[in-house]
Amino acid sequence: MPDIILMQDNAAEKNISAYPKAFLPLDGKIDLSQFASYKVDFGKVNGKCYTLPFDNGATATFLRTDTLAEAGLTPADFNDITWDRFIELGRIVKAKTGKPLVSMPQDSADFIAIMMQSAGTWYFDANGKTNIVNNKALHECMRIYSQMIAEGICLAATDWNAYIATIQTGAVAGTINGCWIIGSITAVPEQSGKWAAVNTPRIASMPESVNYSSNGGSSWMVLASSKNADVAVDFLNKTFAGSTELYDTILPKSGAIGTWLPAGSSPVYSKPQDFFAGQKVFEDIVGYAAKIPRVKYGIYNYEARDAISIALYDILAGKDITEALKSAQETVMFQIGE
C-alpha cells in the first residue's frame, strides 16, 4: 500500500465518511491556512481535515482575442460581468462572427456546477439534505444555461473529445472551465498570442454570487495504515506545503497550477505567458482561487450530478425546469434513502 494517495476533491468527503479510519487527519501537522480555503473544506469531515490541496480547479473564461476583435470586443468586456451580460455579448459574437461564444459536452452538468459554486450553494444543504427542487440558484442556473443553448451562444458538443475539438479548431470563441483546460488550449501552438483569460460570470439575481468558481481538482491524503506516516507528512510539508521551487518546476512542465497561496508570488507564476499575449495568467488564476466560495459537495455528490445531468437534458428537450428538478430530487432521495 502507498503512504500517500491523490484523490479527486468531489469524491473526498464520500470516501472519508465511508472509511473513517483509512485516512490520517492532518490538523496540526500541516499549515492548511496557506491554501485556498475552498479547497481545504473539501477534505473536512466532522471537524477534521484529511486532505492537502493540490491542483487548482479555479475557473476562468478563456477567450480567442482574434475572434473577439472581429466582433468589436476585447477580453476586458468579459471581466467582472454577470451571466446576463455574458449572453448579451454572446449575441454580438454570434451575429458578427457566426460562432458560438463557448461550448460544453451535452452530457455534462459542469456549467451548472460552476454557476452553483459561484453562489456558494450546492445540491445539498448544510445538513446534507437534498436541496434541488427548491434551490433558487439551481433554477436560475438551468434558466441561464438553457437560454444559452437555445440562442446558440453555447454549443452542446456530442462528447468530451468533440468539446475539446471546438476549442482547438476555433469553432467557438472560447470556453469556461477549470484552469486545467489550459493544457488543451496550449496544445495548438499556432494559436499562441491569440488567447486571454478573465474571471467567471456571476448570477445577477443572487447577491451572494461572485465572479469566481471551481471545477475539478484533487488533493493529497496520507493513509492511516502507513508505517511511515510521519515521514509522509514531513514529505508533504517540505514539498506541496512548503516549496515554491517544486511548484516552479511542475508548472511549466505540466501546467499544474497549485492552490498553495505562497506559490502564486513566485517568479514563475508571475511570468508573462506568450501564449496568452503576455498575460500573467497563472498569477491571475491563483488570485481567483483565493476568492472561490466554499461549498460542501457532500457524500452523494456523484448521484446528484448524474440526476442533474438528466434533468438538464430533459429541460433542453422542452421539459419545465421545476418539473425536471422535482424528478431529479426524487431520484437522488430514492438512491440515498432519504
Region annotations inferred by a language model:
Residues 81-87, 155-169:
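Short helix-initiation/N-cap motifs at beta->coil->alpha
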Residues 15, 181-192, 204-307:
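C-terminal lobe and pocket-closing loops
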Residues 8-60, 85-87, 114, 196-199, ...:
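Hinge/lid segment of periplasmic solute-binding proteins
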Residues 87-92, 128-157, 200:
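Glycine-centered hinge/linker elements that transmit conformational signals in sensory
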Residues 1-13, 31, 75, 204-207, ...:
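Conserved N-terminal structural module of periplasmic/extracytoplasmic solute-binding proteins
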Residues 1-7, 21-22, 98-99, 169-178:
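Alpha-to-beta junction loops
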Residues 6-11, 160, 177-182, 218:
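Beta->alpha turn/N-cap motifs
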Residues 48-54, 59, 69, 84-131, ...:
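Extracytoplasmic/periplasmic solute-binding protein
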